[in-house]
Amino acid sequence: MAHKKGGGSTKNGRDSNPKYLGVKAAGGSTVAAGTIILRQRGTVIKPGMNAGLGRDHTIFALIDGVVTFRNGRNNKKQVNILPC
């Protein structure tokens, strides 16, 4: 017989909060200046024309315009904002 009860329940029961990463404004959508376009961990997608990069690698619009995604140099994905 075991001399202690099962202690598994104290070792379980943790779960991290969701981080809500991903694209927030799809390609072709109209955005205002300051709108978050996508949240990411690391620079998987790079900011292009009229797009800024936050300190947590969030890409946001610098001007009012239309969001476009394309492959930039060295086949890296890039987000551009075209003025409308």
From Swiss-Prot:
Keywords: Ribonucleoprotein, Ribosomal protein. Belongs to the bacterial ribosomal protein bL27 family. The keyword Ribosomal protein applies. It comes from Pelodictyon phaeoclathratiforme (strain DSM 5477 / BU-1). GO terms for molecular function: structural constituent of ribosome. It holds the Pfam family Ribosomal_L27. It comes from the Bacteria. This is Large ribosomal subunit protein bL27. The gene is rpmA. PROSITE patterns: RIBOSOMAL_L27 (PS00831). Residues 1-21 are annotated as: Disordered. One of its GO terms (cellular component) is ribosome. InterPro entries: Ribosomal_bL27, Ribosomal_bL27_CS. GO terms for biological process: translation. Transmembrane segments: none annotated.
